[in-house]
Amino acid sequence: YDRYEVVYR
């Protein structure tokens, strides 16, 4: 991933 905003949902 590069989306470390939505990874930890």
From Swiss-Prot:
The keyword Membrane does not apply. One of its GO terms (cellular component) is extracellular region. Keywords: Secreted. It comes from the Eukaryota. It is found in: Secreted. The keyword Secreted applies. Expressed by the venom gland. Transmembrane segments: none annotated. Belongs to the non-disulfide-bridged peptide (NDBP) superfamily. Short antimicrobial peptide (group 4) family. This is Venom peptide 3. It comes from Tityus serrulatus.
